[in-house]
Amino acid sequence: MGESQSKQESNTRVAQHGSQQDVDPTFQTKRALERERSSPQVEQSFLGQLQSLLGWSSTSKDVPLSQLIREMDHESRRHSHQSKKKLDRSEHISEGTIPEIYEKRKETISHTQSMEQKYLFQNFTKLLLLQKCCPGGSEKLVRESWHPCVPEEGGHMIEIQDLFDPNLDTEKKPQLVIIEGAAGIGKSTLARQVKRAWEEGQLYRDRFQHVFFFSCRELAQCKQLSLAELIAQGQEVLTAPTRQILSRPEKLLFILDGIDEPAWVLEDQNPELCVHWSQAQPVHTLLGSLLGKSILPEASLMLTARTTALQKLIPSLGQPHRVEVLGFSEFERKDYFYKYFAKERNTIIDFNLIGSIPVLLTLCEVPWVCWLLCTCLEKQMQQGEVLSLTSQTTTALCLKYLSLTIPGQHLSTQLRTLCSLAAEGICQRRTLFSKSDLCKQGLAEDAIATFLKIGVLQRQPSSLSYSFAHLCLQEFFAAMSYILEDSEEARGDMGNDRTVETLVERYGRQNLFEAPTVRFLLGLLNTREMREMENIFACKFPWKTKLKLLRSIVGEPFCQPCHLGLFHCLYENQEEELLTETMLCFPLTASGPNHMEATVFQTNVKRLVIQTDMELMVVTFCITFSHVRSLRLKGKGQQEYKLTAPAMVLYRWTPISEASWKVLFSNLKCTRNLEELDLSGNPLSYSAVRSLCTALRQPGCRLKTLWLVDCGLTSRCCSFLASMLSAHSRLAELDLRLNDLGDNGVRQLCEGLRNPACNLSILRLDQASLSEQVITELRALETKNPKLFISSTWMSHMTMPTENTDGEESLTSSKQQQQQSGDKHMEPLGTDDDFWGPSGPVSTEVVDRERNLYRVRLPMAGSYHCPSTGLHFVVTRAVTIEIGFCAWSQFLHETPLQHSHMVAGPLFDIKAEHGAVTAVCLPHFVSLQEGKVDSSLFHVAHFQDHGMVLETPARVEPHFAVLENPSFSPMGVLLRMIPAVGHFIPITSITLIYYRLYLEDITFHLYLVPNDCTIRKAIDEEELKFQFVRINKPPPVDALYVGSRYIVSSSKEVEILPKELELCYRSPRESQLFSEIYVGNIGSGINLQLTDKKYMNLIWEALLKPGDLRPALPRMASAPKDAPALLHFVDQHREQLVARVTSVDPLLDKLHGLVLSEEDYETVRAEATNQDKMRKLFRGSRSWSWDCKDHFYQALKETHPHLIMDLLEKSGGVSVRL
């Protein structure tokens, strides 16, 4: 009892510091940090028990737990410091030099005298801080739940000293910093740390002369204040006269903590009507004027608020720095436990709760939950109970806290009254209560004293008011009040409806499931938790009424698809019946334009941005009850696979903790419908792989496909994988590429593959780095098991010297080289597709012909233009750019934009190093020269991971739109249509003519299409399948109109079917319209013409001559599926052949009439040198069939036998069909 009393007094002192109203883990654990450690042997005994509780591996007696924490969680700690910047050494510091102090601080919990110093960085409770990025000029069309700024790259992690650093885009120092985050995540803690750091001379001394901290819940108690009175309240001791303080407003910082808590509307007022700083005015008006910059416009502000409150609270605050608090890293969670319990070193306790720790560690990323858990453990120790931590949810933990702190059931009536007080305060947005408020509610004096003593309530000495220990605790009590209401009077469905209406009125439909009260309410409606409530309140609840209330809350119209808040609520509830019923009815596709704010325009694939371990845990938990068949946790740089629908893709930009991996894989033990899991690009530790393989061995796991590309796996992980393969009968496909498994690891995999229980049919791994012996083993396995296919498409795992940006030689890992060099099967394109830059043409490589994926390496800074595609890049340094040809139908289908916008150019999927490209010119085919199209109607559509964004280009030129400082994703130009104009948009078009010879008969195909390189390429490939060859002729000179029809005619009597062509846009994946023209004898040539059907004016004419045609090509044999990846001999040795063929004319003579037409023959011969002739010859070889290249090879053998023999010996074979 004495210790409890001491702790209550300590809590009171905490409340007095900086007007603290919430439970602050920083202050709760500071005592333990500052206390001298004595008797290391006894301490080690206690800490040994603690590490058992936390699931940490044992260590030798001479190693302190602080060191163990540092060593075992180095990766988590490293990440929490990855964005750390050096402090400005010019800061004025009153007590020593910060950089020296900071650098001396080790990544551990020191047991030395230094812990007694009051330097900030030695007693900070570290929080993960994410600075959000909101790209300017972007109009977000899609958001999941409400992410007011879904960053393209997730923002970046920062430290507390970076809060007021200049914006990366504008280089301007922010005047407004918004600290946002979930309930209990540590926003107020951070705000108080900033104030205390400034007071102690640790932060911002060079920028701010005065820092004022205000608790908005206390300010709301004041009806009117003058600016002078506000400043006086914001300082414990007034350091200067008000007039002097206000003389330099740019040196002032106002911290407004919990600005979303009071029920006020912050209204700005006309600057001309602003009163003098000594005159009083309504508080909400005063604060509104500060925010609106009507008064002290040069001053800086820091606000804290829950993320869900920002949208309606402050709709127009310009461009603030937005920083989201993500809670504790895993290291800091364990660190917190150590600090909290360090004072208990004289207590010997048996901990036996290892099994539930991963879930609890994940819940404890929220500092308030950390405090709650530690308080429960402490109460159990004080009461001599056997420690029991079976709680899987925050709701269960709160009930455990109540059962441990409420002294018997005699307080149940007063506890009900306290719940009513909490609910009334939540509805009225009140968190401070006077003594009379408590008495009016029915709380007795002795009950108030008891609640203060056990820490549920706390007194505010400055205002003589009371509050709950934390706002989350008040919201928990409010949730209990809704349960208790119905137990007193069975109101049935009407009571349920009234409860739901009250919740909607308080939180709004948009944010209903984000509200902690609603989450607690769903958690309390769990069967187990309701029984716990019955024990606490000594009553029985009407179960049927509770079930109806449950369904009315999660039912329509409030339930939003893929809403993170709903996932949280379902996780808190944990009822399998409700989870299955809700998730199986979960809409996975957009049902119309009204869902544009909540869904993504890609059917059957849902995308969610998750920022924390907690969000990952609740989402994966709920997914296992849904129809989702494929789950991807997107990592960086991973290869994309096509997922089986319905699918879900989760995006996260912060590392995943070990505890979270364990929880995620635990959820996979019973997957119901989930069959595919893609973790590629996410680093997996040894213990994470062990947890994954343990889950895969469970009978309830139905995963059939597992992608682990570039997950940092080593040979040490292969024993778990092999054991899983031997035991898991469902896994059919496993991808382990870009992992350093080595010979030993692959041998272990072979053992698993030999097991008769293994049903794996596809295994992908890197074979180039393996020894011949291991490769032989793999081939033997394939031979023995015909169903097993082992594939590899990546380069060798070797470390080779490369040159870094400073000109120094460095070692590049095999994985980096694979990402830089790509696939070993590369084909050089002809010069028609080259990028022309400062140093001349730069060749483009084919990475994957089937996927239309290409790569170009731009060697230096400058401007590069590709005439074939119309793309233009301006780069600041050497950079490799990947370009994929896409189809609009794949992305734009079934979106509202298909009715309001028209496609205006090709769609490209471009990837480049961030910051290397300062401008990109995207081609469009809308004709601006007609003067009928306003350039402001042009937009660039970005199809990003989290949805689609429309961006306004910097300028629009006749043939392209310019984006400056672009971010890349599938992107292309759209034109907003005006109803009055309709389809009468002038466009630039092209004609494509193809022919095929059969004896003397000729068949032509004539196309009229928009000038889109992706359409042209699709037509080229389709015609080549039927041995049609393109003839290049000039396009129409004038702009044409979509929907117009044109008559096809000829100067000779020929067969034309159909005789009309309509100019229309069709996706490259669709069949294009063409006219087929049959000519019996071309003679000296024919004229083809296109005439506008409506106005009968000639719009295009071309003369086709015999010299345009080549003899009939040999028929191509059917190639195997892997033929596109197989290079012909002449393509493999292109560079050698160009350099070493010394006699070209005899070679041309052998190709003349078989491969080369008369015109081609003369064109090649006209080049000046042998090298130029060979380059010209290879340029034309792009359209050759495999058989034509065989003819080329035979001609080379006859004219240059020694050269061919030399190349054959070096290559070990020849890729030809004989």
From Swiss-Prot:
GO terms for molecular function: ATP binding; ATP hydrolysis activity; cysteine-type endopeptidase activator activity; double-stranded DNA binding; double-stranded RNA binding; enzyme binding; molecular condensate scaffold activity; pattern recognition receptor activity. ATP binds at G181, A182, A183, G184, I185, G186, K187, S188. Activated by pathogens and other damage-associated signals: activation promotes ubiquitination and degradation of the N-terminal part, releasing the cleaved C-terminal part of the protein (NACHT, LRR and PYD domains-containing protein 1a, C-terminus), which polymerizes and forms the Nlrp1a inflammasome. Nlrp1a inflammasome is inhibited by DPP8 and DPP9, which sequester the C-terminal fragment of Nlrp1a (NACHT, LRR and PYD domains-containing protein 1a, C-terminus) in a ternary complex, thereby preventing Nlrp1a oligomerization and activation. One of its GO terms (cellular component) is cytosol. Keywords: ATP-binding, Cytoplasm, Hydrolase, Immunity, Inflammasome, Inflammatory response, Innate immunity, Leucine-rich repeat, Necrosis, Nucleotide-binding, Nucleus, Protease, Repeat, Ubl conjugation. It comes from the Eukaryota. Residues 77-87 have a biased composition (Basic residues). Residues 835-1118 form the FIIND domain. Residues 969-1118 are annotated as: UPA. Belongs to the NLRP family. This is NACHT, LRR and PYD domains-containing protein 1a allele 5. It comes from Rattus norvegicus (Rat). The gene is Nlrp1a.
